[in-house]
Amino acid sequence: MSDIKEFNLIDVRNNSSIVNDLNNVYKLWGYEEISPSFINNLETIKGREVIDGDELIGIVSNSSLCLRPEMTTSIVKLTSTRLLNKKRPIRLFNSGIVFNKKQSYKNTYKFQENLQSGIELISYDTQYPEIEVINILFDAIDNINLIDSCNLTLLVSTTKIMDLILFNYKNNNYEEIKKCMVNLDHESLDKLNIDNNDKAILKELLFTRGEPAIILKKLKNIYGNNNVIEELDCLFNTLSKISKKYNIKIQLDPTYQPHLNLYAGIVFQLICDNKNVKTIIAKGGRYDELVRYFNPNEKIINGIGFTISIDNLRELIVEKSQTKKKVLLLFKNSYLLDKGINEQKALQKKGIITILYLNPCNDNSKANILMKEHNCTEIQWIK
């Protein structure tokens, strides 16, 4: 069973327009384009446990390969090979299709392909590379003409908060507690054999999310002063100012954990609430350990990036008006064909979309029908 994308022409046009608009923003921030291979080494993906092996789509002719489930791993690997001598920091952007499969009913799988666009910032010698990456995300989305009813929220967390929450349970129901917190499973948490006071704290944190300053204060009251909370306080102080300029809300969710096992540190999602229908537009986070894995000798071991779902974004844009001039060239006599070819080229050099009808046409009513069939805005007769 497969989820094959058969886009109509409008979808294809909108996809291309969105990707081009995003690429133009990335370039203004100094990012260079890269195109990772569609084929990944299976052991590279499995070795880093980036994604569940059951979600990978293998290659029948070579069991050691798979279609790429995401692009970050391939790009980070390049920094230790072809890009090893490139000056740091490395700023890259990409766009393309990723592939995965999801378990469906009766032990069958549903194949999926998703078009995405994103950036990677690797080995940036600064404490908070998140500031640049999230700023670019806001700028990129701001350059896309979204529908007015799309209210944006950046949901942020860090794997370090979950580490802080689970610190006292390393030898006592660690995995069970983590699963309950990530899945917001109040019922299973209630059944665990742990101290009642601890259980009450975990229950309170289970549905804790909101304005970062308020959530950080709550965490500080529970866990006291520590580096994790202080660093988040500094980061959100800057991000909150940036988000206000773009009219994007920021929420801190201590229990949010990403699906891909790429990230260690800050993780985030950009969510659109369109009339109470929530859509994830973008995902991202830090992957310092992935950088270390591929290049342990890297002097500045950090990496962060995001991916934007073009498929989801396309459903939320205001479609651009297609009133661009498009000329249909017609002639009444066959001997005018050569002149028509020259005229078509002359108009195209001026940037005018031009279609030359290769058969003679002597009927004005037929000419109007041809103009509509070719979606042209006007007719020019070759004389």
Swiss-Prot record:
Q: Does the keyword Transcription regulation apply?
A: no
Compartments annotated for it: namely:
Cytoplasm
- Output the Gene Ontology terms for molecular function: histidine-tRNA ligase activity
Q: Where do the coiled-coil regions begin and end?
A: none
The alphabetical list of record keywords is: Amino-acid biosynthesis, Cytoplasm, Histidine biosynthesis
Q: Which PANTHER family match?
A: HISTIDINE--TRNA LIGASE, MITOCHONDRIAL-RELATED (PTHR43707:SF1), HISTIDYL-TRNA SYNTHETASE (PTHR43707)
Function text: Required for the first step of histidine biosynthesis. May allow the feedback regulation of ATP phosphoribosyltransferase activity by histidine.
This chain belongs to the protein called: ATP phosphoribosyltransferase regulatory subunit
Taxonomic source organism: Prochlorococcus marinus subsp. pastoris (strain CCMP1986 / NIES-2087 / MED4)
Q: Which taxonomic lineage is given here?
A: Bacteria, Bacillati, Cyanobacteriota, Cyanophyceae, Synechococcales
Which gene is this protein's source?
Answer: hisZ
